[in-house]
Structures are given as C-alpha cells and as structure tokens.
C-alpha cells in the first residue's frame, strides 16, 4: 500500500445528487453516486511565509449576502468571490499552491476516470437508538428468568473500584450525523460539461448533503509491483 504525497491531495467540494446505475460496454450494471462539484472557487492561498503551511482554501455553493458575517464577507470580498455554503481548505505542497490564485476556480478535470478517491460527508442521522442497533450488541435471553431486560446493555461499570463509568463506554445515544470518510472509491465517469463526478458505490450522507472529494490517501499497490 502506498501513501499519496500531501501536494497531491488537492480535491473538490460538492453536493451529493443521488445514486443511479450506468452500464458498461459489456452490459454490466454499475451502481454510482452522482456528485455535483461545479464552481469551486479559491478564496485564499496559504503559504509557509505568511501562514506557516501551504494550503488552498475553497468554497462551494451560493449563499445570500445577508447570511454572511462581516468578517467572512470581507475575507471573500478580498478574494473577489461569491459567498459559498461551505468553506474548506486542502493542505498542498508549495509547488501546487503556487499554481493557484484567489478568485480562480478548480475544474472537475482535477480527477480522471479510473482514479481512486476518498469521499467525506456527514452520515444520515438516525436519532436516539439503543446499544443493539448503535453498537451491534446482542440481546439478553428471551425467557428463563429474564424480566423486562431483553434489550438492555447490561452492567456499565464496577462497584467501589473504580466506582465510575469509563469515558467512551458504549451506551445508548444519538446514532449517525457524524463525519465519515469512505476510502478508495473508483471514479467511473467525469462529466466535464455538467461538472459531475460519477463514483462507484455509496458515499456518506443524504441527498443534497455536502461532500469533500480527495485523491485516495491509501492507494493499494498492484500485485507484483515493487
């Protein structure tokens, strides 16, 4: 397994349109997720001299001017770009950062068909759930002395020593609505005319949810390669 260079991790922001299937020339059906990555605007280029590290800050989407704070409005006005719905930055090498300027755009051509990518999004919220659904616990006995304790997790701590519940104990609670990353997804098709990426398989989040697409950080080396 090889690891991508930091300078090769420049990606795109987008929105999950939904899922569909396409057919190959051989007639095979391929499930894909359609990602809209249009109009990625560069809001800031960070350098080692001014910021201590190299990065490219990008915004996606459109937002009303009345919904933008004054500090953010001034920051975007300096770059000469329209306010977006999300703002992210990608750590890159100094050489890559030098290729971009504030006010420019990132094309969908950053990615190519057959390339491996990591897609990050916010998973669908499931509300309050128990330990069986949330943590894959097993239930208690259905009968033989069990009374009203069929789906309880059981003991959560010990008695006098240590006398407390350890942090991170798996218990009931809110499930989903967290940042998730699905790695090593194949790009099946790049639609430059409509600024769309068709990625094989599912990606985190609901329809119209925001996603971040980056080149895969864990690229599996082909068998037989040195």
Curated annotation (Swiss-Prot):
GO CC terms: cytosolic large ribosomal subunit
Composition bias, Polar residues: 137-158
InterPro entries in the record: Ribosomal_uL3, Ribosomal_uL3_bac/org-type, Ribosomal_uL3_CS, Transl_B-barrel_sf
Keyword RNA-binding: yes
Disulfide bonds: none
Any GO BP annotation: translation
Pfam family, one: Ribosomal_L3
Key words of the record: Methylation, Ribonucleoprotein, Ribosomal protein, RNA-binding, rRNA-binding
Keyword Ribosomal protein: yes
PTM summary: Methylated by PrmB.
GO MF annotation, one: structural constituent of ribosome
In-chain residues carrying the UniProt-annotated modification N5-methylglutamine: 160
Renumbered residue ranges of the record's region Disordered: 136-162
Function per UniProt: One of the primary rRNA binding proteins, it binds directly near the 3'-end of the 23S rRNA, where it nucleates assembly of the 50S subunit.
Quaternary structure, from the entry: Part of the 50S ribosomal subunit. Forms a cluster with proteins L14 and L19.
Protein family according to the UniProt entry: Belongs to the universal ribosomal protein uL3 family.
UniProt name for this protein: Large ribosomal subunit protein uL3
Organism the protein comes from: Methylibium petroleiphilum (strain ATCC BAA-1232 / LMG 22953 / PM1)
